[in-house]
Each structure stands twice: as C-alpha cells, then as structure tokens.
Amino acid sequence: MNKEEFINKIHGGLIISCQALPGEPLYTEEGGIMPLMAKAAQEAGATGLRANSVRDIKQIKKIVDLPMIGIIKRDYPPEKPYITPTMKEVDELVETGVEVIAIDATLRPRHDGKTVNEFIKEIKTKYPNQLLMADTSNFEEAKNAYEAGVDFVGTTLSGYTEESPKTDHPDFDLIKALVDAGLPVIAEGKIHTPEQLKQVIDINPAGIVVGGAITRPLQIAKTFTSVFEN
C-alpha cells in the first residue's frame, strides 16, 4: 500500500487504537483480546487501526482487513523513547506486513545512540517502500521528522514529554500548525470525547486516531467511578 492509498482509506474516518500492556486488565500472555476489540472497531465503522506488538498485529490481521499502524512498545532505560525505538523493532514489524510503522521521532537521546534523523534514514534505506509515521510531541520534532523522510507526522506524544505542554485535551494548536504547514498529519492523543473529535475533524488532518476513550475499559470506567469520589 502506498501513501496515497493509505490516506484514501483512512481520511474521513477514524483510526481506532487497540492496545493493552502488561499489567492492564485486557492484557493476556496468549493475546486474543485485541483482535476482538479490532473487530468491534471495524463493525463500528473504523477506517483503520493502531496496534502494539507482533502478536497482536498478526492476530488482528487474521480477522480484520483494515489498514493498520503498527508499533512495538519496548523500554530501554534510562533512555525515554519506547515506541519502536530501534531497528530491532522495525525489523519485527516489517515481517508482519503492517501498512504503517510508527516510531518515536522526538529529539530525545536514544538507546541506539543514533539521532532520529539517522534512524529514519536507516529505516528508509533498508525498507524504501515501508510507510513510516513519526510519533512527535511538538512542531519542531514533526517538521524535522518529515524533512528526514517520514511519510506521516503524528501528534501522539504531545503532553507526554518535557518538550510539550501538559494538557488534558488534544493539542489543537499543534495539529492546526502542522496542517497549515502542509504536513500529512495523523492527529492522535488525548481525544476523549466526540466533541473534541469534531474539533479535530474541522482542522482536517490526513487521519485521526482515538484509543483509550474507546478501547481501555479501565480508563473509561474510572471516568464514571471518579464522579462518586468528588
């Protein structure tokens, strides 16, 4: 799938992120739960998916035929990047045939010692036809990653790094600035409500991802149970 085909499939619809990490209620060693989430997402009208781990991606692909953004979350302390942080994770994801691979494209120090520009160049040299998405937290990071060769820039990490504003809502200003700059933006992060989604739609990015507000029942339930604590 090329860049234009991917945009045509996802634009005007919603990419739903289906993830569960160790320690979360929906995580199991053998998997099997995220494919059901993905199936529900497809039946609800999602135009794409975002998934974590080779296992989940492969299991989802067996029952759902939506285009997918794939990542591998793997910690390499003390460095902070953990979303597809090295070529090892990229190699694993390429083997799954996932349509887009997302990487941490912040300017923070990396486990492999490379700059993010060197990492992007290495990926695009090894896998020239692989679509690549940059998970970033601010305008500088996104612009840098796009100029380095990624196909899409995501606002995924805004609010989660020291280099971005701490808010409890989507970074509307960042999404708009990137769209206005002519970058292919996948808006993601802290979209909690349909009203916030509508605001993002009005900015008209190439794609939009919603995750926790749909597929993390513990997080969703807490928004209700917390009412009793106030």
Curated annotation (Swiss-Prot):
Pathway: Amino-sugar metabolism; N-acetylneuraminate degradation; D-fructose 6-phosphate from N-acetylneuraminate: step 3/5. GO terms for cellular component: cytosol. The keyword Isomerase applies. SUPFAM superfamilies: Ribulose-phoshate binding barrel. GO terms for biological process: carbohydrate metabolic process; N-acetylmannosamine catabolic process; N-acetylneuraminate catabolic process. Its EC number is 5.1.3.9. Transmembrane segments: none annotated. InterPro entries: Aldolase_TIM (IPR013785), NanE (IPR007260), RibuloseP-bd_barrel (IPR011060). It catalyses: an N-acyl-D-glucosamine 6-phosphate = an N-acyl-D-mannosamine 6-phosphate. It is an enzyme of class 5 (isomerase). Gene3D superfamilies: Aldolase class I. Keywords: Carbohydrate metabolism, Isomerase. One of its GO terms (molecular function) is N-acylglucosamine-6-phosphate 2-epimerase activity. Converts N-acetylmannosamine-6-phosphate (ManNAc-6-P) to N-acetylglucosamine-6-phosphate (GlcNAc-6-P). HAMAP family: ManNAc6P_epimer (MF_01235). Belongs to the NanE family. This is Putative N-acetylmannosamine-6-phosphate 2-epimerase. It comes from Lactobacillus johnsonii (strain CNCM I-12250 / La1 / NCC 533). The lineage of its organism: Bacteria, Bacillati, Bacillota, Bacilli, Lactobacillales.
